[in-house]
Amino acid sequence: MKQKPLSQGNSISVFLNEFLNAFVAFLFAASAPVAIIISVSLGSGLSESDIGSWIFAVFVFNGFLSIAMSVSYRQPLVFLWTIPGAILVGTALNSISFEEVIGAYILTGALLLCLGLTGWVKKIMDWLPMPIVMGMVAGVFVSFGLDWVRAFEADFFLVSAMSLTFLAVIALNRMPLLLPPLIYALIVGVIIIFERQGFETGEFPLTAFIVTPKTYLPEFSLSATLELVVPLAVTVIAAQNAQGIVVLKNVGHNPPVNTITSYCGFMSLFTALYGGISTCLTGPVNAILVSSNRPDAHWISAVFLGVFAILFGLTAPTVTNILIAAPPAFLATLAGLALLKTLQAAFSGAFSSSHPMGGLIAFLVTLGEVPMLNIGSPFWGLVFGAIVSFVMERKSSN
């Protein structure tokens, strides 16, 4: 259905509505996904300055890209970073250096750029069955779900309060403030922490409020290339971009698939130099942005979100310092709750399909976290899943 163009009479209310949608989407992007970066980084031994530079890169550069693309196409094309990819990197950092990871980011960006420019994205995804990709994603994500469960032992009251709030908001389904359930859980968690002891951030000079991004010299190694490049590219194309594209198409937009892939690769080359992981089109954030009934104005909320992202990225040291000071159980709960639906979708996609055995093998091999030939398990999950599916499920293939 065609919408009437914005008029003076309704422009203020439309702009306000799009602004609020953008703010809600930003709260989501700046909470649990950032907590996942912090959790992965701390578990891998990265420094606070490394984490701050990572957050700067994925918010600031992608914020500018989101504004440019949304204005150009008059669609809500918001780009951030691949969350499954961040978890893959956390696993990889157990065996390779961060500089080698940076090298893999650059190669992934080049691969995505090539796939977008040649239009091979659809062919690649047709060759690699989605259930196998989802099996690999489930194997990577499941540890975050388990960490949330284990957090009950570490801090039962905090984790219970956050989890019950999350479930209660979902059950009521009609809260006066149209915020995602995760934001209510975040607010409850922050209140409890401040009531107890506050966030003990120590000395934090004003000069550290604005980020001083680090630049990295990439190192290229065969092990990092094999372990990360293909899995990262697959998560960008299949686990992230595909989700965002479906969200946009469902409300009548026509996102440029090959152009999106090309710009994901192009921007990944820049974010990598500052420690940022590969760029992707977002799914959940774009889903929030398109929740209004004015498709012709959705791009406005994407522009607002891009501005929020840039400002947030510039204050990355403050964000990093506060989140690192938070109790581990808080971060584990935030990340676990945020990934519940994604984990459910990954399991459903892996096993409720025509390639369940391939999905199962991909899941088990990835979950096992056993590196072979000095290459991490997510890569082997895809390899063995594809082989088993080809041998046992050829009749199910299209």
Predicted regions and their residues:
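Interfacial segments of multi-pass membrane proteins
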Residues: 88-94, 166-170, 285-301, 305-307, ...
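Membrane helical hairpin/interfacial module
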Residues: 51, 57-58, 65-121
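Hydrophobic, membrane-embedded alpha-helices of multi-pass small-molecule transporters
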Residues: 20-32, 180-181, 195-196, 213-243
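Membrane-embedded helical hairpins/re-entrant loop segments and their flanking transmembrane helices
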Residues: 2-15, 39-65, 230-299
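Transmembrane helix boundary and interhelical junction motifs in multipass membrane proteins
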Residues: 32-36, 78-86, 241-242, 276-286, ...
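Transmembrane alpha-helix interface/packing and boundary motifs in multi-pass membrane proteins
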Residues: 25-27, 65-77, 173, 267-277, ...
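Membrane-embedded alpha-helical modules
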Residues: 95-200, 305-398
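Intrinsically disordered, low-complexity non-transmembrane regions of multi-pass membrane transporters
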Residues: 1-21, 197-216, 390-398
